[in-house]
Amino acid sequence: MNVVLGSQPAEPAGENEDFAAVAPGVAVLLDGAGVAGAETGCTHGIAWFSSTLGGLLLSTATAQPARSLAECLADSIRAVRSLHEGSCDLTYRASPTSTVVAVRAGAEALEYLVLGDSSLLLADRGMGPTAVTDRRLDDVGKRLRGPVDALPTGSPEHAAALAEYRDALTGLRNKPGGFWIAGPEADAAEHALTGTVPLEALSSVTLLSDGATRLVDRFGLATWPETLAVLGSGGPVELIRRVREAEAGDPDGRRWPRGKAHDDATALHWLLLP
C-alpha cells in the first residue's frame, strides 16, 4: 500500500481526538466528538473512544472480509461498549462519540463507509474526484447555529451560544430527523453511507476529518480537484498547513464563522497503483 498520513491537533500541546490507521487493504479514519464542559459519564475521554473504536474496526474489517463494513462497525461499537460500560455511565447524553470513514479493497471493488461529517475523496481515473460526505450533521447544524455564527469566535458570548447549540445538537444525535454518529449504540452503524466502487476506476482514495476539509467546505478557498492536487504534490502535511494558514488569518471567525478557531486535522491519502 502506498499511503501517506498526516494528523495535527487543534492546538500544539492539545490532545488529538482524530485517529487514522491502515492495514493491508483497509484504512480507517475517526474524528472523536463530544460536548465541551459537559458531564460525559465516561472516565476515558474522547481520544480514547475514537482510537479504541478505530483500532477495533481496523482489525475486524481486516480479519472478517465476509462481513460488511457496517457490520464490522456495529461489532466494534459493541466491543468498545463492553470495555467500559462496567465503569462508565453510557446513558449520559454527552457520552463520547466519533465520526467514521472506512474503506476496504477487495479483489475487484473498493467498499466504503462514511458516518458523520468526515469525508471520503474518491479520485476516478477519468472523471476526477468525488467527495462522499454525510451531510446530516451539517443540515441539522444549519438550523440551530445562527446565533453562534453571528458572534466572534472565542468571545464569552460565542462560548455561551456555542454551549447552547451543542446541547441542542446532542438532543438530536442518533435520532430520526437528526444525525447519526458512532457512540454507545451499535445500531448507528445501520445509518452509515455505504457503497462500492470498481478498483480499476480509482487512482487514489483519501480519508479526511472535517478539520482537514475546511479549505473546501468552510472557507471556500479550494475545490476538491485542487485539494487532490495539493495532496499529490505536498501530501497531507501541506494540506493541513494551508488550513492552519487560513485559520490564522481569521482567528475570531468574522470571515468564516465556526465553532472552533482551529480543529484537529487528519488526512490519509492512499495511492492506488495501476
Question: Model-derived features: where do they sit?
Answer:
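PP2C/PPM-type serine/threonine phosphatase catalytic domain
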Residues: 1-274
